[in-house]
């Protein structure tokens, strides 16, 4: 889908344990990824780590200029405005009071910043360029007229997330992410599902 897109986008996979930075062009990573500890318990250290990671990727690009920063973040947030947190975030407790991360990074690096939920982006990526088109291509090759356009994707890591695509559109829910956020664990009273299933 984006194989001829010459724009360079700096990426980040923001996990509760590690932050993994990269740069993509035409759907391919073009520099060696940078992995740094997330420092999720300390807001100042976490923000410094993000600036360091993005700066190292920009340095690795040399003369090539990125068009934007785009990345995934766990949990509910005001993603359209780049504000992370504002509630219970077990993987990033230092973001609990809400952090204007998108505007901070835009001001620091001078390029647009796009942030979305990690579970949502996983599901949307699989719907656009992953398993869903692969299944539909197999159906077409087999002579079937059936095509799928709905998908639910689950993510397991330090946390647990879900993304949902319905009629080829990302369903963001009413908190900018469709997931089992703070759902009580049925078999383990006192903890949420995320704490009971994550690795």
Question: What name fits each language-model region?
Answer:
Residues 2-52, 84-86, 170, 174-189:
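Short glycine-rich, Thr/Ser-proximal phosphate-binding strand/loop in the N-terminal lobe
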